[in-house]
């Protein structure tokens, strides 16, 4: 293209370009001849026309991952696009049209960069072919429409024409759907390669298939892209819903796709290539593979892959006989349209797809101009005419409002050639036999088929079941439902009974669950019918001293290790528990509050021991046991001093318990001080709630209550015995008021009236006058006495609710907590504060020690490894693609050790390694270990740093070498300390080894080579391998190296090695390597450098060993 300024749409600015021809123009070009009018009118017309109207060159951009995907690059897009443009420009039919030029545009392989590539491309071209990444398709459509550029996508499943966007070059989704419909394979799974391009293609394809009604069961990614990742992906397919076909969204193995090779090999290993699944490659839909006698090398070289590929069906573009991609490539090369040195066997068939896309775009331009009479046309007009354009494609005629035909290719397990089985027309959805049937693995049939309803538009498929089977199943379900309805009632009650008599939530208790105790003194019958006062007076030690007894009708026992109380039902002929009783008790068992006694179960047992008559059946409610007895008993014990705080605490507990019951809609009906019990913490709890309801459900006749029991009963209940049995909420409030009188006065109800219980009950039942207790004003706060009298109101509606009573009572106590143990808590508050301060100090000391421990641990192991070991999680070995290792040792260390005391050797190494440790702190390196005089450092692990590892190690080595030049031993300062340094770069594996004193160790040939570089080095020299030198030169940071020459490395052979002698800008002094005498050792110290006294000592210790040196 000429050097003209480009405007939007990629067309030249008419003010800067001199067009070659004006009679015919590309899209947007009016084809009128020069206007024979005054120059001013012509200039005005030129300024009013769009810029693209004045261009004689139509630039086609071909966008794809040519630079980052080698298989796409093998399509030689530059040659394909130029070949198409050259043929278009030579076409006589297009002589009056624009000149076509092509430009190759790179598309990143990662999704985040695709949109930027599209945006950049639209500003440089008149028409665009691409993008490849489906994630950029929709944004590309919008950007192309805004820029007025015709867009021809070639790899966007589900893309519809519209605006400036033409239909996809290859209808991949339509063709694949037609194939699945022909074989009735509705349930499919998609496995994609891990690259962004294929992941997005899988998502777009699954959305397109689901939009057509197919149940895509799974879309998964093969990560990592090796055999292990393939196995995991196939296991997910196995574990998911049943599928018929697996669509492989990745490069075909026939083009060198390693992911598909691993996937097919894994399928063969897992037994999935046996015909139970069919594997369909996705990428072959975008180019043409042709059957023929030529053997496929990738199948011929691997018998396992050949067997696995037998389960693959390839749907690809159809080429006419003699017109395959390879045939056309040969003809183009023979006509010198392609370079003669081009290896056609290495060219991907995607070559033809690129060629066809450029021709389709050119055909759309020609038809659009023809329809406009040679006048100006927009990008949308070009895109609209592309489907109708009929052009000679690279593999047959394209366009003409018909989708290209496809062919279904197959192989067999014994051969390595492709043969055609069916011809597929996506437009009609027809499948015509090509003469050879499909060969399924092991000679079996297809992997089955799904109901045809999946492929019928507007029909909701019933999970893959035929309608007749659905109707039959419906009748069967109805029949089973009717049969089950007769069993449901029985099974429900049976299961409920099982749950009640077994398991952790059972409520039916027997002699196996409850252990009864015979109390000291008194007969059995007396204990059963007595109050809780006799049991409350017993100590724990007294109860535990009594041996276990058989059932003796006692009211106390042991259940699951806790004391329990049994409230016995009247009568002794209880054989079974009625279902209504179980239901009622289950609801009562759900009541849980700190001031309500917890019901644990229903005890049903038959006696024969303990004096009970044969056939006797005991039924009782088992509840938690409160050791201090009832409130009535507590008030009767005069040796217990009760102040107002104690009394208010008891009353507040009673009010809270009753408020909870009323909130749950439970009317007590039998509330009295004998039904209020106190536990060992002096917490009052309400008991016997719902007892009348249980009696009624069990159909037990209640004996008429005595006058003494009716002293707490409200007047309206005394007048209605039926209402008295059920109880009411206002009646409970009246009973509460009587209990308040008991607690305040510490006397029996109505004790101050000097009347018998019968007389009191009669006067309360039949006023006037009203019969109520009399309470002195000095016995309680005035507000409490007024609240008490409100509870005694004759009319039920005038009595306050429990919520109102609770609020009033709290105001009487001015919001203070009145629990009896609060006093003891206040006494411990000061001690608690002091204890908190002490704990805080100890915690701070512990945190300091923990920090010290963590600091020490991170000095021994990498922080990530240290954290994993502290958490107790295993540390998996990690592979590092490229690191640089440093090895160094002290020249003549054995001689120095022989001349030194052990403590002097330790001091030497400590001083030297302390110097090294200070230096490595300023570099991005990790100290691996020290063994004797050997010092090992690595960079690039455990934290990767790109290629910086070589520079970090090289800088550190220069710093260490400079520092060693001025280092002196404390015990032999006149003896120089010379070190040898070896560097090498390469891959390695790092991991933690051992459980006791675990070490972070490195493994691999890189470690051995780095050690060999050190051992073959020279004093005061940094010996560097070619791998490290290559990285240092790539970093271009001015590192200076010298060629040492060929060096024999143990186990590696002779290699070219180098000396690292400096770096640009490195001004620190570096010690001069000593001159080597012929025949002298490179790995020791000469005797002339050893002081006489030390030399004499060494000769004395090893006579004759150094005499010749």
Curated annotation (Swiss-Prot):
SUPFAM superfamilies: Nucleotide cyclase, Periplasmic binding protein-like I, Protein kinase-like (PK-like)
PROSITE patterns per UniProt: GUANYLATE_CYCLASE_1 (PS00452), GUANYLATE_CYCLASE_2 (PS50125), PROTEIN_KINASE_DOM (PS50011)
Extracellular face of the membrane: 56-466
Domain of life: Eukaryota
Post-translational modification comment from the UniProt entry: There are 9 conserved cysteine residues in sensory guanylate cyclases, 6 in the extracellular domain, which may be involved in intra- or interchain disulfide bonds.
Single GO molecular function: protein homodimerization activity
Entry's localization field: Photoreceptor outer segment membrane; Endoplasmic reticulum membrane
Alphabetical list of SMART domains matching this protein: CYCc (SM00044)
Biological process terms in GO annotation: cGMP biosynthetic process; intracellular signal transduction; receptor guanylyl cyclase signaling pathway; visual perception
InterPro entries, A to Z: A/G_cyclase, A/G_cyclase_CS, ANF_lig-bd_rcpt, Cyclic_nucleotide_synthase, HNOB_dom_associated, Kinase-like_dom_sf, Nucleotide_cyclase, Peripla_BP_I
Chain ranges on the Cytoplasmic side, renumbered to this chain: 492-1109
Gene Ontology CC: endoplasmic reticulum membrane; photoreceptor outer segment; plasma membrane
All residue ranges annotated as the Protein kinase domain in the record: 492-810
Expressed in which tissues: Expressed in retina. Low expression in cerebrum (occipital lobe).
Membrane topology summary: Single-pass type I membrane protein
Reaction catalysed by this enzyme: GTP = 3',5'-cyclic GMP + diphosphate
Keywords recorded for this protein, A-Z: Cell projection, cGMP biosynthesis, Disulfide bond, Endoplasmic reticulum, Glycoprotein, GTP-binding, Lyase, Membrane, Nucleotide-binding, Sensory transduction, Signal, Transmembrane, Transmembrane helix, Vision
Guanylate cyclase domain ranges (all copies): 884-1014
Spans through the membrane: 467-491
Signal peptide span: 1-55
Functional description taken from the UniProt entry: Catalyzes the synthesis of cyclic GMP (cGMP) in rods and cones of photoreceptors. Plays an essential role in phototransduction, by mediating cGMP replenishment. May also participate in the trafficking of membrane-associated proteins to the photoreceptor outer segment membrane.
Quaternary assembly: Homodimer; requires homodimerization for guanylyl cyclase activity. Interacts (via C-terminus) with RD3 (via C-terminus); promotes the exit of GUCY2D from the endoplasmic reticulum and its trafficking to the photoreceptor outer segments. Interaction with RD3 negatively regulates GUCY2D guanylate cyclase activity.
Family as reported in the entry's similarity comment: Belongs to the adenylyl cyclase class-4/guanylyl cyclase family.
PANTHER family reported for this sequence: GUANYLYL CYCLASE (PTHR11920), RETINAL GUANYLYL CYCLASE 1 (PTHR11920:SF228)
UniProt name for this protein: Retinal guanylyl cyclase 1
Species, as recorded: Canis lupus familiaris (Dog)
